[in-house]
Amino acid sequence: MSRLYGPVERKPRNEYGTLHLVRFLGTDYGRRRIGLALSDPSGLLSRPWKTLASHGNRHAVAKMIGAEIAQLLAEDDGLAGIVLGYPRKLGGEPTDQTAAVTALADTLRLSVSVPIVLQDERLSSREAESLLARRIKNWRDRKPLLDAASAAVILQDYLDGRAPMSDRIAGPEDLES
């Protein structure tokens, strides 16, 4: 379940009549580290991108994430939206981190021009750990990758739930001029 901060506009075609590709940034915000993930330009798949050190208050963190967003907006693929992991307990109650994420979303919303979505992140770290453990046996080698992998899980959950597959995949009629 996601909570939307502003509309996510999706333009199916650009001015040349070809499919308009969209990219999203996924974020797993923690007290020590911030995991970042990116979707592919088609908006179908996520991948871990990088991990940032989280130090300072939410304004400092928002500034740091804002710099990453500015860099992504300047690239050819652009950025259609930001997906922030929204922490909840298994029963749905807020955690001690929920208010911090909501405050970060509010701060980011004031400083960036792209929509922000809060996406349920329950069990995302466990799923990311499980996925990494299949490829990397040593915990010390997995640990630095965990936050970005968790962000990729959160982002993939959002991408999977945002539109039916038929709305996201080009058919033969989309390939004709």
Regions found by a protein language model. Name each.
Residues 2-27, 31-177:
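Phosphate- and other anionic-substrate recognition elements at nucleic-acid/protein interfaces
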